[in-house]
Amino acid sequence: MSVRHFLTLLDLSPAELEALIKRASELRKMQHAGEVYQPFVGRTLGMIFEKSSTRTRISFETGMGQFGGHAIFLSPKDTQLGRGEPIEDSARVISSMVDIIMIRTFEHEKVEKFAQYSSVPIINALTDDFHPCQLLADMQTFYEHRGSIKDKIVTWVGDGNNMCSSFMAAANQFGFELRVAAPYGFEPNPELMEKFKHCVSLVDDVQDAAKDAHLIVTDVWASMGQESEQNTRARRFAPYQVTPSMLDKADPEVLFMHCLPAHRGEEISHDMLDDPRSVVWDEAENRLHAQKALMEFLLKDKIKLN
């Protein structure tokens, strides 16, 4: 049987994604109820980090432990990858010793090549192009608060970055309408815009983009590696700050999400995270449950499901 990987949301069918989101919600309830479920006893997750993270490391490492497995953290200084070993060689060796691998790195081509030569599932835990694990948590969070996101309106505010690209893929897979409000010069990848033009549109006025939206999402103005552009970006993105008054223009049942960390006073107003329509804390916790569901799905042929 061929190995399944999760490099973008397009690697799973819409039906598989919907089932995974519902399973993640079940796993959250099981965890909160104190139920012990350990299908990964004797299994090992290799975690390759070339970009640092709080939520990604904690959620994967904790999730593997809760499942009864073991996680190994590998930074560039811990592997021969950091010394120039070819990706195909590292992929063959590491995958021969672990059951599943997650990679958080810069170039998306790196995870694609790793998957090409790996004998076990590869999970993209973030690249410069996509952040699909975050979208699993976001879709789970919407499902838990509002039910199905199909045919809803989602508004992305800010940089057309890897999170925006992942929301574009999510619009296609989950069947919602995505509006993107981004400053000129910071629009999403044009190839993705063309690919997903049936469900994604650019809206010039950010207030118009927020009208009747069921979900409003934003991210930092300068992503990791763009710190030198911070001042320039701050000037260009200032009109795109998400505030409670912006949410007032949306649907009465609107939710607000942010993948965190957030910069209060920049992409969001100081009071936005504390607004009752904000679900960022559930969203952050759901990284744990969504990724547990993902790992369970990718290893389902090797474990006993509960």
From Swiss-Prot:
Pathway: Amino-acid biosynthesis; L-arginine biosynthesis; L-arginine from L-ornithine and carbamoyl phosphate: step 1/3. The keyword Amino-acid biosynthesis applies. The keyword Amino-acid biosynthesis applies. Keywords: Amino-acid biosynthesis, Arginine biosynthesis, Cytoplasm, Transferase. GO terms for molecular function: amino acid binding; ornithine carbamoyltransferase activity. GO terms for biological process: arginine biosynthetic process via ornithine; citrulline biosynthetic process; L-arginine biosynthetic process. Pfam families: OTCace, OTCace_N. It catalyses: carbamoyl phosphate + L-ornithine = L-citrulline + phosphate + H(+). L-ornithine binds at residues 162, 219, 223-224. Carbamoyl phosphate binds at residues 53-56, 80, 104, 131-134, 259-260, 287. One of its GO terms (cellular component) is cytoplasm. Belongs to the aspartate/ornithine carbamoyltransferase superfamily. OTCase family. Reversibly catalyzes the transfer of the carbamoyl group from carbamoyl phosphate (CP) to the N(epsilon) atom of ornithine (ORN) to produce L-citrulline. This is Ornithine carbamoyltransferase. The gene is argF.
